């Protein structure tokens, strides 16, 4: 990783710049701007931010049903009994749920795998939440599983694997429509493209 420290800057500031620079999407210049902004910001604002970041590690866990992020036993979506219980949308990461919920065209439940099958990285079906998904399908309530893994090599491999497991159960398996460019992560797709991909999902 590129060194973001500044020789002419105090050690504590350099430490903050270095820490911010380790965040995804934050380059050296952005890290420096954020660090100097935080130095000028009111103390209350900085302390609130610090407490919020700390609470994420101390209070946030995973929903026991879908493995979305949650601050109690169940995430807000799984607590909502008005959603369509016959549909489960399978995603790779919790942030994919945020993208789909923002579009507002899907009213079923979710299942977060926390990854995708990737032999090159040593990630197999046993390393992600596939067994838990199959257990959820045993209650007979679900009649459609929507595979919303990313349109990447790993996402496609995971979707194919899941389809082979789920289809023999007599459950309809669909995949988001091909409007999403290959290699794109779901969380970065625009609302219109994502909406069309969900509404135009196809048998898989």
UniProtKB/Swiss-Prot annotation:
Keyword set, alphabetical order: DNA damage, DNA recombination, DNA repair, Metal-binding, Zinc, Zinc-finger
Annotated Toprim domain residues: 86-181
Database matches in SMART domains: TOPRIM (SM00493)
UniProt GO MF annotations: DNA binding; zinc ion binding
Presence of keyword Zinc-finger: yes
Top-rank taxon, per record: Bacteria
Keyword Zinc-finger: yes
SUPFAM superfamilies recorded: Recombination protein RecR
Coiled-coil parts of chain: none
First and last residues of each zinc finger (C4-type): 63-78
GO biological process: DNA recombination; DNA repair
UniProt record similarity statement: Belongs to the RecR family.
Stated role: May play a role in DNA repair. It seems to be involved in an RecBC-independent recombinational process of DNA repair. It may act with RecF and RecO.
Protein name as it appears in the record: Recombination protein RecR
């Amino acid at each position: 990783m590129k060194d973001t420290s500044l020789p002419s800057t105090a050690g504590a500031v350099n430490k903050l710049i270095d820490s911010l620079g380790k965040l995804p999407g934050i380059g050296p210049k952005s890290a420096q701007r954020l660090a100097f902004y935080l130095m000028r910001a009111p103390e209350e604002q900085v302390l609130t931010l610090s407490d919020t970041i700390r609470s994420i590690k101390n209070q946030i866990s995973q929903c026991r049903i879908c493995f979305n992020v949650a601050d109690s036993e169940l995430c807000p979506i799984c607590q909502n009994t008005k959603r369509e219980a016959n549909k489960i949308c399978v995603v790779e990461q919790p942030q994919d749920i945020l993208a789909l919920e923002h579009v507002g065209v899907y009213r079923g439940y979710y299942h977060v795998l926390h990854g995708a099958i990737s032999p090159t990285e040593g990630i197999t079906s046993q390393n992600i939440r596939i067994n838990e998904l199959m257990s959820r399908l045993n209650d007979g309530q679900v009649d459609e599983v929507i595979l919303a893994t990313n349109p990447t090599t790993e996402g496609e491999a995971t979707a194919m694997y899941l389809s082979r497991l789920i289809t023999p159960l007599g459950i309809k398996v669909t995949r988001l429509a091909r409007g999403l460019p290959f290699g794109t992560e779901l969380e970065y797709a625009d609302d219109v493209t994502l909406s069309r991909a969900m509404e135009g999902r196809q048998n898989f």
